[in-house]
Amino acid sequence: MTSTAAEPGSAERWGPLWGARADDWARTEDQQVPTYEEAIRRVGIEPGQRVLDVGCGSGVFLRLAADRGAKPFGVYASEALVAVARSRAPEADVRVAEMERLPYADDTFDLVTGFNSFFFAADMVAALREAGRVAKPGAPVVTQVWGRPENCTFEAMKRVVRRFMPAPPPDAPPPPELWRSARGDGGRHTSL
């Protein structure tokens, strides 16, 4: 599937869902800190590096990057969570944007991350290519997705939470599609 200007992007499709309970989502993101720390340990963040978090949520990773002296940037689908991220990491440049059409020049970032975000793209291949496009040559692109349902404790939580949330778009892709997309896009990706 290829995105066109007429098709809704990820922000338009998912922003209302994630923005509906922004403070609740923000509280749950703290559970991701061990994953974020492991990503930082593996790829490193140096002072002055430009770091982009695609799907930055409430800005926890942006805060960790800023604490290490990086210049953090983030994009997200929901204005409500962008506001939370801006308050958590005021030095970060955080904006609502489509991950399939990132508002940055080629070769801008020393590190691009996407924690549990790329599989929400309206066009995952386009989103992954965009991550590669804005990464400097040789810069890592770190992705994280949920595990296979049979190995993922998050699946149980999703079943409960699903009862209280609006339904996702009917054509939302399953997480395994991300891996097929990542293998075929020719980009530079580091997966956790």
Predicted regions and their residues:
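Class I SAM-dependent methyltransferase SAM/SAH-binding core
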Residues: 50-54, 58-101
